[in-house]
Amino acid sequence: MNELTKFTNQLAKPETFDQIQIGIASPERIRSWSFGEIKKPETINYRTFKPERDGLFCARIFGPVKDYECLCGKYKRMKYKGVVCEKCGVEVTVTKVRRERMGHIELAAPVAHIWFLKSLPSRIGLLLDMQLKQLERVLYFEHYIVTEPGLTPLEKFQLLTEDELLEAQDEYGEDAFSAGIGAEAVKFMLMDLDLEQEKEDLLEELATTKSKLKPAKIIKRLKVVESFIESGNRPEWMILEVVPVIPPELRPLVPLDGGRFATSDLNDLYRRVINRNNRLKRLIELRAPDIIVRNEKRMLQESVDALFDNGRRGRVITGANKRPLKSLSDMLKGKQGRFRQNLLGKRVDYSGRSVIVTGPELKLHQCGLPKKMALELFKPFIYARLDAKGLSMTLKQAKKWVEKERKEVWDILDEVIREHPVLLNRAPTLHRLGIQAFEPVLIEGKAIQLHPLVCSAFNADFDGDQMAVHVPLSLEAQLEARVLMMSTNNILSPANGKPIIVPSQDMVLGLYYLSMERQEKTPEYIEEKDGTKIEKLPRFADMAEVHQALETKSVTLHTRIIARVPQADEDGKPEMKRFVTTPGRMLIGECLPKNHKVPYDIVNRLLTKKEIGDVIDQVYRHTGQKDTVLFADAIMVLGFRHAFKAGISFGKDDMIIPDSKEGMIEDTKKQVADYEQQYQDGLITQQEKYNKVIDAWSRCGDQVAEAMMDEIKSQKFDKDGKESEINSIYMMSHSGARGSPAQMKQLAGMRGLMAKPSGEIIENPIISNFKEGLTVLEYFNSTHGARKGLADTALKTANSGYLTRRLVDVSQDCVIVEEDCKTDNALEMRAIVQGGSVIASLGERILGRTLVDDLVNAKTDEVIVKAGTLLDEPMVKAIEEAEVQVARIRSPLVCEADQGVCATCYGRDLARGTPVNIGEAVGVIAAQSIGEPGTQLTMRTFHIGGAAQLNETSHLESISDGKVEYRDMPTITDKKGRILSLARNGELAVIDAEGREREIHKVPYGTVLMHKDGAKVKEGDRLAEWDPFSLPIITEQSGVVKYQDLIEGTTLEEQTDDATGIAQRVVTENRATGRKKKEDLRPRLTLLSEGQSEDETEAQRYLLAPGTTLSVTDGQTVEAGDILARASREAAKTRDITGGLPRVAELFEARVPKDNAVIAKISGKIEFVREYKAKRKIAIVPEEGEAVDYLIPKTKVIDVQEGDFVKKGDTLISGSPNPHDILDVLGVEALAEYLCTEIQEVYRLQGVKINDKHIEVIVRQMLQKVEITDGGDTVLLPGEQVDRDEMDEANAKLGRGKKPATGNPVLLGITKASLQTRSFISAASFQETTRVLTQASVEGKKDTLIGLKENVIVGRLIPAGTGAGMNRMRVTASARDAALRAQWKKQQEKLAAADEAAMAAEKEPEAEVMDADAMAAAMGGDSAGGDTKPEAPEASEE
């Protein structure tokens, strides 16, 4: 027995295994775990509280209830350890064994395991090739099944009712065939299966099948059959003969007072199983009638089902209080299940929580810890110190002292706490800056003090927030806390590399106030000798004089002065320089570190919040961390002091309502009335009127706001030239301390348009502002949107958290594994330009990335930066100055590292500003960076009327000087002399003087081009414009128009606008009427050249989609360039712009959008093949090769006409592109670019900056899988989805001359990707636990514990950060062990070769669970490396 405890405990140490395998337990395996059979349903005796013998809590099976004491009390105490009492049969040992010993129930009839039956796809069903419905009929005793048809005409696996069975037996004789019912029959069929034979049959069928749908089904079955063969699981183990019973301490029964018991639901479920099982045994012994026995067997099957997974089949079994009982599956599932509640999240000792208050006098690395809390948290350390100092003799005395809080204790607490960091955490911890380390400073009171600058990282405010404190105990933990987690080491945000320790609110206001200039009197000028005029200003020699002048009030903080400011030169020597500045700015300048790279100029300006952030950024880049921290602390103190000294406040008169407001509102009202009139006259539609009204009012609101801002900003001077005080509200808003122009607009401008909860905008705006007060109606209108905002916020938090969870799950195992993967692939980066303005410059996008090619200055041909360099700020500046347009960089997307990313592809660690370290968990950082701002995103989908959204995108302006170049763009000049583009996918490029492309735009069909090809343009020139609301059909030659298949009433109707009475001819959809076969009507316009008759085929045809408005009449003569018809772009007009969180989730989940665009898969000419009832088929015919067909619903507007030439990747039907199509047609880089741009778009609208590389890391994780197109000579099957690594492994195993497998990359959404990771532990702890575990156990999966999550679950250091080094050491150590072991084996074999008989004897135990050497190693460490894990046999062979 001692061996056994030694052995089990040995296994319990987490270091002793390398992988975890999951499989299906055989009945023998279950019996071998068990310490005895449970025969009775009793639990404990209600009077004595002792467990009943042979019951569910039996002490004989599971172990003693009290430590070292048998049940009857004959043997007590340690000395009898290991004795088995002869009276009660209980072994004397620790009671802890009741947590680990299992029992079992021998079933009187086999039952099917519900997981393998009902978890879709049903494994039993796939193996037997039966439908689940039929299987259930057999298992639940409704039908018989023919297991052996013999010579009868019955089919194998045919279902028979009882009557049919009797008939068949009468007809063919009882012994001619065999049929069974229930789990016994299924078990017999499973035992009968010959898996190898089945596999051969399936492979043959796969090779010969002709149908399209068959292969998928065959592959499914084949995979199950193969996984059974490979894993060594036997199919019949899916049918249970023995049910294991988990240890009693894991399903406790606790007596409550009053003689009642609180019990775990599992006990009820087990009791049910035992009762039914015993009843069944008795019935079988009594030879009861078949029907009774069968019913009892069915009930047994149902009770075992409920035990394993209650509610999976049939009714949920409920307890006494009508609550469903929690089955074994429920114990694992969900947030409260074993995985997420106990393995991934645990409660922590040595922790406390309290309210936080601000601590402005703290240094950045400190926090105030209440004495009471510290005393409790550091207790063990205090005891140790008291003992070491010899102050207290015993632990008891030490405890007393601490409880009495004697003064010695406080002194010792001070010693203990010194230099011992504590961790502070504010929930919700959305990113890694939500837990930071500080050095505690003991304070009176009961609240924790927090340094104001770290609030933004914790997202904390002091309105009652609470924070938790944790104490790192071990030396290593303290070291990590100090070196990695100290608040001073987290100055930059990991999401975007910008400082996150930035003053906010009061501090910003104080600094802004300090850095302002205010004119005291009209400036006087002195004329120099050379005639230049210099302003006459007070001059100061140094800071001391300035201080004195301020004290004597001879200057104010804002007076313009000339002063000498000490600067450091390149060698660090001080030198004095003159600056025109103000005393206030000099105070800020005093805080700057003395460094020649940080000149006084950077604070010699008006400092807003953004500017202060830039200053801190520059200080950090040039002078390092220590100086930055000192600087940050200094300006914090300065900011607070001067905000308080300035005494800035505002009253109602500071909100100035502009006088021009009335006039603007009157004008707008006139305009709106005008639009109303136009609508009445039928010149515009209802939708257009709505758009225009909304447009007019939003313009009016902006104008009022602008007038108000001008009024507030304006500087007024009195007669002496003294400037009036600056408006306080403006100061607060402009400095970035509090408030925004939008809020000021509501206070003193006009509130503007409001939205309904549906997201639509109400046409009547709120004209008043808060200063004037709202009318009742206006107030009511505004409550609408406000209430929705509050409801949204609640939903948002949950949604955002779930998105973060999915992101973390998909990317958790993405870690930096090596320095450089040496790949040649790269991504092309260029600036993002939208609507003529640069949104993200090239420099911003490539900062901190590794270059792939040399970057060359186009003008001078010199190399600016060499390939392979990590770009830092100065290099990026040089690149931007040389106006480089495109750079190729390394990216996590193209990295070829195994099981992670390499440092070169990732580039700079944003939170440190240095190259990333090996072991950095970049996946988790990426997930947090994207998920953390999630709560700031909106939840709503915007329904924006066309005008408001699309008026910006109806023209193009040039962003640079250069010449225009049209690519693939045929044009035509109409009779007005305008140049029209006839290209579906033409590009308009602007080329500068050096021949570099400055911008490339795709312009829609029918665009009016402003310039001839090759014309010179200046920055800001208009290049093109188009109508965003309709898609024209333009004639390319002159001729006569003929209507074809345009029949009044069927395909053409005159639509009159109700309000206006103006008629338009609109093509309608033709629905087949009557019985007769519908004529195939293809409404189209044909253009005949003059003098052509209709049957000649040269005519141009234009097919019309339903909803097209005709602009010409039948037989009209038209010129080239005329518009024949307009297809309304209704789709684009009020397309809901899915905004915010839902959009981000949609992109990451790789969902196919609702109206998805159709993309051309190849280049070629368009041909309309034929029409069907609701669809039309069009084909793209390439110059060589096969045509590709598309089926397109007739209601969709097709962007191309017959005969057009399209390029691969062009859109045939506009809409949101489908990411899967982009991947198939245009490849990985295009997809990454698309996802990055789209996701960044959402965040950019909210003003959130996230570095592209985080999105790239997630997209990389979504592209891990490939779909096999050709299995080659490997075991992989075409159509199967496997990890890219798996495909590479399979190919690597092939010999020479064999054909490797090939595959295409597949895009998986984040949820799907998480569920398909190679680690089943990680997948099971994410979602759909039962499904994942069922699948894994069938395949006999091994979890190699590579990712972070699996290691947290089994309780190890994670293989990232400081754990990465340990991990590498473990791997090398185990490799050496394996080598030594192999050597030792060889020696043993040599010795054994002498003695054949000994060898035979040695073989037997080796077939046990572990091979003998691994066993020996596990017992007592082994020859080489102490307790490094014994290598699994396969690994040592590799």
UniProtKB/Swiss-Prot annotation:
Binding site for Mg(2+): D461, D463, D465
Protein's UniProt keywords contain Cytoplasm: no
GO molecular function: DNA binding; DNA-directed RNA polymerase activity; magnesium ion binding; zinc ion binding
Cofactor note: Binds 1 Mg(2+) ion per subunit. Binds 2 Zn(2+) ions per subunit.
One GO CC annotation: DNA-directed RNA polymerase complex
Binding site for Zn(2+) 2: C821, C895, C902, C905
Protein name: DNA-directed RNA polymerase subunit beta'
Record function comment: DNA-dependent RNA polymerase catalyzes the transcription of DNA into RNA using the four ribonucleoside triphosphates as substrates.
Domain of life: Bacteria
HAMAP family: RNApol_bact_RpoC
Requisite cofactors: Mg(2+); Zn(2+)
Gene designation per UniProt: rpoC
BP terms from Gene Ontology: DNA-templated transcription
Subunit structure, as described in the record: The RNAP catalytic core consists of 2 alpha, 1 beta, 1 beta' and 1 omega subunit. When a sigma factor is associated with the core the holoenzyme is formed, which can initiate transcription.
A Pfam short name: RNA_pol_Rpb1_3
Reactions mediated catalytically: RNA(n) + a ribonucleoside 5'-triphosphate = RNA(n+1) + diphosphate
Lineage, top ranks: Bacteria, Pseudomonadati, Pseudomonadota, Alphaproteobacteria, Sphingomonadales
Span list, region Disordered: 1413-1438
UniProt enzyme class: transferase
